[in-house]
């Protein structure tokens, strides 16, 4: 994916050039016209879109116009459950909840425990499935009710997916998936077949509703290869093409392009206690100067600062965020003070999230699609 950065569904490395990535994938930048169309139907625009976290799409305008015609559609995203959830994972889910609330549509959420088992030589299947149930608590904690959220744990809920997946698999050649995902002769056949399952969920609402029901998929840009293939074969299977809305990666606390589960200090996890959260924030990389004197004299650079990045995520007030930006640039705001302000915001969010998360424990099966379909 270029000499300076790599972006695949399984690996993100280097400083990501998002415009270059857009050209390579062939997705479209999100325009002011499309944002205005969203505002027309939703009544407002979520800060994650206004502030550029979601920046690209495939046929986002189509799904909005489809909605305007009063036709049915659904939302779809997922999670590869290989460990605990951090804030970066939750960004598409937060927008997913907003869309569901604004438009009253159902959500299909895939937990790909099979994929993580196939991909990680050390991962036991029971471990991946266990993480699927744990991660589901974080999704439910965002406020979804079982009438709107349909969880699909691949190894537990395969029945409604499999007939679609085999039709999808028949349309995908080895050469196609090899070129798309970079599979090699040493790739196990589970991983090679897996894209059929992720694609299948994009077509599942049409099967369940017995009428064309396209999906909107808010997800990180690294998932685009799956949905390019889904769009390529949709017509041949008589399904509507899935539409997508792509986010950038959430900057790591270390200043790198993306949080990494392999470096716990690069991310804030939903189950981090408050002491750990504060420690991570206070030790985060910043766009500030080496000394307070230099900061006051020259100001900082919020554009490269993960602390400011997090303020944009957790402060809904545009004026407040802009004041932080300007005070940083002018030198009126020092990094230590800025970090403490951020800790207050994140601490409040996580305290409430953890409480809702624990209330969801033992209720995951109420949300599972195959349980509802029995």
From Swiss-Prot:
The keyword Cytoplasm applies. A motif ('HIGH' region) lies at residues 81-89. Its main location: cytoplasm. It is an enzyme of class 6 (ligase). InterPro entries: aa-tRNA-synth_I_CS, aa-tRNA-synth_Ic, Rossmann-like_a/b/a_fold, Trp-tRNA-ligase, Tryptophan-tRNA-ligase_arc. One of its GO terms (cellular component) is cytoplasm. It catalyses: tRNA(Trp) + L-tryptophan + ATP = L-tryptophyl-tRNA(Trp) + AMP + diphosphate + H(+). GO terms for molecular function: ATP binding; tryptophan-tRNA ligase activity. It comes from the Archaea. HAMAP family: Trp_tRNA_synth_A (MF_00140_A). Belongs to the class-I aminoacyl-tRNA synthetase family. PANTHER family: TRYPTOPHAN--TRNA LIGASE, CYTOPLASMIC (PTHR10055:SF1), TRYPTOPHANYL-TRNA SYNTHETASE (PTHR10055). This is Tryptophan--tRNA ligase. The lineage of its organism: Archaea, Thermoproteota, Thermoprotei, Thermoproteales, Thermoproteaceae. The gene is trpS.
